[in-house]
Structures are given as C-alpha cells and as structure tokens.
Amino acid sequence: MQLILLSGLSGSGKSVALKALEDTGYFVVDNLPASLIAALIETIRASSEKVAISIDARTGETIATLPNTIKQLNASGVDCRVIFLEANDEALARRFSETRRPHPLADKISGGMIACIKEERRMLADIAELGHRMDTSDVNPNALRGWIKDWLKVDRSRLALAFQSFGFKHGIPIDADLVFDARILPNPYYDPLLRSLTGKDDKVKAFLHADLNVAHFIDDIASFLVRWLPSFVRDNRAALTIAIGCTGGQHRSVYIVEELAQRFGSEQQVLIRHRDLG
C-alpha cells in the first residue's frame, strides 16, 4: 500500500493538495487524528492501494504520536511518505483575512491570528522534519497542484533534487535546504527588451550565457553539489531543496535553475519549481 500523510499549517494549501491527490487516484481522508491512522490502514488495506490522509493541529496533541506511527507502518510493509506544507506568517494571516475564516486554534489561543499561527507552527515543528517540505507562501493553487503531481513521480528510494527559483523581494523560501544568491550577476531587467521576459526565454538565456561570471556561478554550485551529494544521501534525505534567488525571481534565478536541472537531470531525480513566476 502507498500511504501519503499530508500535514502542514492551516491556510498553507492542504485542501488543494488533498484534492490533487484525489484526482490522481488516491483514497483521501481529511483531518484524521494521528492515533487512528494505524487502525484505519488495517481496515482499508485490502481494498485501497493508494491512500492519502490529512493531519493538522485540529487533531490536538495526538499528532505527537505520528513519528512512531510512521515507523510502525513502514515496518508493516506500508510505503509511507510525508508532505508538509507551510507558508510565512504574513501569507497565512492574509489568506485567513481574505476568506474571513477564524484560525482553528482561535478558541484556544489568545493574542490574535499571528499568535495562533506561531503556536500551530510550534505544535507541528517535529512533523515538518519527517518528510518533504513545500513553502506555499507565494504559490497559487494551480502551481501547488503541479508541485504535488511532480512529487508523486519521485522514486523515494533515491534522493530527489528540487531546484527552486525565487525573488528575494518576496522572501526566502522557508523550505530551502541550500540558498544561493544570484543578485551579484548581471540583471536582464535593466534591458528594456528583456524586462518582460523570463529566464526561460531565448533572449534572456543568450544574455546570461554570454557572461562568464554566470557560467562560473553555475559551475561552482554544480561542483558543490557533486562534492556533497553523497553526504546528503548518507543522511537519508528524501529530497534536497536548492533555492536560487535573484531580485524578483524572474530572470537570473529561473535561468540558473533550468541550467542546473539540465545538468543533473540525467543522473539524479530532479524537480523544478519557479516560485515567483505567475
């Protein structure tokens, strides 16, 4: 049986992710207490090959039992994987304001929305380290659905490299394992003919390809990864998120992510995410 445990902060997009899993053939269960997971799996094991269960702070402190539950499930032959969705405080508060919904912890925590978000983040901190983290702060629902479907294709027995572009003016991705700053490189934004384009467009690629510093920057990151990937593998990582940032996340970071993904794609599992492209 394939089991995906979907957890994360309220407002981070779990409903969207759960629907994406359902659309790909998973039997989904929303907001199941962690203490009931093993019993549910035992009940439906014979009839369902792919199951996705959403778990969040509404289940209370029983979520602390999740790490041990995962170990038991894996030992019993269940292929258990964890996705953890998160976002920064400002993005979460904005989403609750837009939907005019109270935070699930509002009746238990005083101090307003931000206090509730921080308490939930504390409650789920250990769970965040169990699986693949996705920062949805500046990600729209369609992009998140794409991320989930790409992640499902990953062979969990091998380390996956997730190359992610972003703009520093929108904040550093909180799910990044490694962050590289490409703002020191020439910026196509200042060429009026390139300003509206992205790092995927041929004219921008030609502009950046012509600069030796860009090539050295990419070579240095690639060399670092080649040198240290064996250590990350020995650390039993399921995925390694390498975030490349420029000012707006439109030109330089996008180009570098595409170049790195192409270099490593023939030998490694590669995921590409452009966080700040529309």
Listing of model-derived features with the role each one plays in the protein:
Residues E22-N31, A261-V270:
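Post-Walker A helix-loop "phosphate-sensing" segment adjacent to the P-loop in P-loop NTPases
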Residues T24-L73:
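Conserved nucleotide-sensing/catalytic segment adjacent to the nucleotide-binding pocket
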